[in-house]
């Protein structure tokens, strides 16, 4: 299963190769800079000391996606351990920490959801509170942050996760893997399927549904 492969990779080299900056610097100088290109990096867990290497006036990229503030609902190593909804206090805390961390170095690309995540409307808003007012409030919280808001397709109309009746209806291999992990951990098929509904990246890849 994919989880075991990732674990082996992390044990081998931490999941990230050292010295990537040499390649990224050359990429910027030879490909981006000659065209004065605006670039967005998909970068995780960059600490304060590394920020100026990655973004800003002399960074590898113009900006990067703000992943840190949207990770707090992910608990444990299995999706069945994740929180059902994003805790608003934790999200507020992480947004403030991230904004202060950036300081005057640069701005980030603020996101609520992307192609690898469940729908933001489902993560951030309890089912009983879903509606025009709550979706509008969520949008306001995103666009009023310092930075550049990035909207993923379907987010502009408040799309939610998509229910599926069986694991065979999912295409994403990591979802199938997590389903089996949940089953092996003692979850029923219904509970494992509920985890898939709440967290599968297939939610972001589905067509508009009613």
Question: Where do the language-model regions lie?
Answer:
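Active-site and adjacent substrate-binding regions of carbohydrate-active enzymes
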Residues: 1-208
């Amino acid at each position: 299963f994919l989880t075991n492969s990732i674990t082996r990779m992390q044990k081998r080299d931490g999941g990230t190769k050292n010295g990537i900056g040499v390649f990224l610097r050359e990429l910027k100088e030879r490909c981006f800079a000659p065209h004065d290109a605006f670039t967005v990096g998909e970068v995780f867990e960059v600490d304060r000391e590394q920020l100026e290497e990655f973004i800003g006036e002399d960074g590898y990229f113009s900006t990067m996606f703000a992943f840190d503030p949207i990770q707090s609902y992910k608990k444990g190593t299995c999706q069945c351990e994740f929180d059902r909804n994003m805790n608003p206090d934790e999200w507020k805390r992480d947004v403030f920490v991230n904004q202060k961390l950036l300081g005057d170095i640069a701005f980030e690309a603020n996101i609520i959801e992307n192609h690898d995540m469940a729908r933001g409307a489902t993560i951030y808003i309890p089912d009983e509170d879903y509606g025009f007012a709550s979706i509008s409030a969520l949008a306001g919280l995103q666009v009023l942050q310092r930075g550049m808001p990035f909207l993923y397709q379907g987010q502009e109309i408040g799309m939610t996760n998509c229910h599926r009746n069986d694991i065979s209806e999912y295409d994403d291999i990591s979802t199938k893997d997590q389903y089996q992990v949940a089953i092996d951990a003692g979850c029923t098929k219904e509970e494992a399927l509920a985890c898939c509904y709440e967290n599968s990246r297939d939610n972001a890849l589905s067509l508009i549904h009613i």
